[in-house]
Curated annotation (Swiss-Prot):
GO terms for biological process: DNA-templated transcription. Belongs to the RNA polymerase beta chain family. GO terms for cellular component: chloroplast; DNA-directed RNA polymerase complex; mitochondrion. One of its GO terms (molecular function) is DNA binding. HAMAP family: RNApol_bact_RpoB (MF_01321). Its EC number is 2.7.7.6. The lineage of its organism: Eukaryota, Viridiplantae, Streptophyta, Embryophyta, Tracheophyta. The keyword Transcription applies. It is found in: Plastid, Chloroplast. DNA-dependent RNA polymerase catalyzes the transcription of DNA into RNA using the four ribonucleoside triphosphates as substrates. This is DNA-directed RNA polymerase subunit beta. Gene3D superfamilies: 2.40.50.100, 2.40.50.150, 3.90.1100.10, DNA-directed RNA polymerase, beta subunit, external 1 domain (2.30.150.10), DNA-directed RNA polymerase, subunit 2, domain 6 (2.40.270.10), RNA polymerase alpha subunit dimerisation domain (3.90.1800.10), RNA polymerase Rpb2, domain 2 (3.90.1110.10). Pfam families: RNA_pol_Rpb2_2, RNA_pol_Rpb2_3, RNA_pol_Rpb2_6, RNA_pol_Rpb2_7. The gene is rpoB. Keywords: Chloroplast, DNA-directed RNA polymerase, Nucleotidyltransferase, Plastid, Transcription, Transferase.
Amino acid sequence: MPVLPELAQIQFKGFSRFVHQKLLKELENFPKIEDTDKEVEFRSIGNQYQLTEPSLEERDAAYQCITYSADLYVPAQLICKEDQIVQEEDVRLGSIPWMNSGGTFIINGIARVLVSQILRSPGIYYNRESDQRGILAYTSTVISDQGGRFKLEIDGRNRIWVRISKKKKISIFILLVAMGLCKRDILQNSRYPRIFSNMFKRQKESIESPEDAIVELYKHLYSATDADVFFSESIFRELQKRFFQHRCELGRIGRRNLNIKLTLDVPETESFLLPQDILAAADHLVEISYGEGKLDDIDHLKNRRVRSVADLLQEQLKLALNRLENLIRQNLSRAVRRKRAITPRGLVTPVPVIAAFKEFFGSHPLSQFLDQTNPLSEMVHKRRLSSVGPGGLTRRTASFQARDIHFSHYGRICPIETSEGMNAGLISSLAIQAGVNTSGSLGSPYLEMSDSSGEEQLVNLSPAEDDYYRVASENLLLSEWRGSEKEIIPVRYQQEFLSVLWEQVDFRSIHPLHHFSIGASLIPFIEHNDANRALMGSTMQRQAVPLIKPERCIVGTGLESQVALDSGSVAISEQDGKVCYIDGNRIELSLIHEAKKNKLAQPTTIEELKIFERSNNNTCMHQKPAVSLGELLRGGEIVADGAATVRGELALGKNILVAYMPWEGYNFEDAVLISERLIYEDIFTSLHIEKHEVEICATNQGPERVTKQISQLDGYLLRHLDDDGLVELGSWVEAGDVLVGKLTPQEGASSSRVPEGRLLQAIFGIQLVNARESCLRVPIGGRGRVIDVRWVYPEDDATNDLEVIHIYILQRRKIQVGDKIAGRHGNKGIVSKIVPRQDMPYLQNGTPVDMILSPLGVPSRMNVGQIFECLLGLAGEFLETHYRVVPFDERYEREASRKLVFAELHEAGARTNNPWLFEPSHPGKSRLIDGRTGDPFGQSITTGKAYIMKLIHQVDDKIHARSSGPYALVTQQPLKGKSRRGGQRIGEMEVWALEGFGVSYTLQEMLTTKSDHIQARYKALSAIMTGKPVCKPKTVPESFRLLVRELRCMGLNLERNFISEEDLGREFENI
């Protein structure tokens, strides 16, 4: 397996480019600021900026729930023009959130990640579209750097229009004149003057000057009335802002693309659209309409660019500096007008910069909550590409072509891993070798085939260059075919797959996983799976929870170690040294080379370990030492494993003995049977940490108090509180127990009515105040062990009146009925029954099966890779061998995977004296014995070791029940949702289920009495508790009353009358 680049490099390189290039560019563009009288001038020296080290460590910032940031200082000068006095000092512009060692940002103690956005690159694109009448027309779309766009289109009479929207278009002649050209310049510089001369003749408006064109352009685009509009500076500024700046600013990348497309020679520093650009675009549009030239493929990656961390942060810094500029201008003018002494520090405040970044990280769609379910989910989240967001596509309007796989995605964007649902095709993932260059283009490395020297050189090809070369597919055996010059090789060339001679190959892929993402690259035998199931497998790997006893997979692909290393979940020794101290919190290394230089003291380095830290997804992040005392280490070696790593390799699940067979119908439709051994031996036991918080603030009646003395509650609920009113560490708490005792003062409305209250108020003017309890309790299903109690003071609280208490509770969850489990091939299921181990089927050597899967879930879903994995895992279990199988091994020979599996099974049976492992009559199957009867089953059954993961979709988080609870105010029906302690909605399918069992009276009570009858439901509850029969209500339920009220609102009066049977019969006869 070749060495892969760092998987999180897109984040690190983007932030480095922001700090060293983008930040300097924006600071240098900060303008000089003068007061209204131009007596005093403020200027900043942006090229001498300084960024200080963050004041806190990453772990301390997360612990104290503050932002991990660095302060930005810039030298500033204040020049008094009259006296020529210059004041210069360093001013603090604000704080910039700093990227940590994991490639994420700590914002208010929470890990967040900036997702890269892929959108259309600025420039010009030619296409053929149909108008509202279905007539095809050639168009050219100009896309600005800010995402604004307009179109040039040519109709059947060779007239060229500028279209701003579906309903608004103007003649190109008006736009050109508004940009400063006259008729003579247009005719002289155009390659098709006859078309423009015909347009001039048909022009109805009389336009002689740019002012007339600006007025006409404004009237056509933005005027809401038909009144006369005259040229003015306000109209010019509004048009400049709403049209030219938003739709005509190309930027450096857009200018480069425009020059290449239209063969122009305009400097890249000219970022705005020029009149000659419009003329050249119109000329090329005419050529396209005559059949000369090619149309653009807008979905090609050469027409896309990636907005990485650098671009997103630069945009926010630009916005913040604009706000700071306005604020400095106001402060300077006010100080000069009032003749106050001013200094540069007195004019600059860090609030605009801090507020802009806080708003960006808190509300921007591309600033997302980091998925920390396991190390793989973190890494995949950092490498995600989003087509939605500001300036991009939308979920509802994105076309199928924009979502589909494109041939230019090869080696750059994974064709498998994407979101499901409305985001399908819009949220994608980078291929493992892909990278982003400085211009935002996605590149992919290839090996260049040299004819003379025979050496292969690594070359990074952009999507635009990829079309001009013959690229061989992912075949590592190409190097062995050099002697056969006449060998036919399959290659990609100009959007097609061809077969050419060896000597005609220009580049080849690096390895078979070249075009897959990380998640898909971790699936062994992925070539034997359907793409939909491979997608589900890569998705569910990100949902696996770390187990308390992680285990390496027997069958892997070889990328497990690099994913674990680059995710940051393992601890690495920075230098060579010897382990001199180990405990659960830290590891100390004595530096060998430094010790030789310094004879007086032996320098050491300390590696602090993560101990039961909560992740964003409530999973447990924990590190365990992986070295022993006195062990010699080299720099870069692993000293501690993470919660989901073993020996430096990713370990998301367990190797479980499975059997593919039906079992009494309990594994019907993706249901799964498990052995009770998985529970008793903590095979699938995981740790989860829940955070509960309560605010302590000052009210109008006084400050809230944290205390244990709460008379309103029973002492049993307060048993875990210490003298300060906080729960003690290590306490085991149940649902309803008090975690923080808190009293909130309130005005005693009832005490003021008693004689004592009125007397005290009349004599002393004292208003009696009582307090209500507002304690923090353990919610339903939140029992566990208290592992941490924190007092947090929010950094944005200027008055220091707000305090927040965080309580962390550790839960140990065993696998149970209702939990979701899955393999790596999209084979998922829900635990339906836990079977005693003596009743489970067992192998011929007496080993009971741990899990029973349905065999019907394999052929219809076409994920045969799980069969290869479980059989090879069985051989590896007996041979005590771990396999790392590179996908697409069919390049060696046909049926290579099947031959490998059967060969290893045969060897395992022969070496361990278990011939039943490989039966020639039924290869891959063996006889199982029924644990209940002791008799063998009638047919051979596929058994093996499969790598099974426990997913975060657990029944403890989903199941909910209530006997009574809150009701809606209008309908008087139970609320919806677990968080509101809601009830079960008896819908259509639930009614069918109850009807199937014939419980008609129970169904009637659920739909009427127990649902929304205010009086009858309390009587029913009392009758059930006392064992008496439930009485039928004499009045109608509340929902019927609501229906009557709604009908009355519509003018329909519904009355209820009692009619005898005879009268009812007469009424029907009259009808």
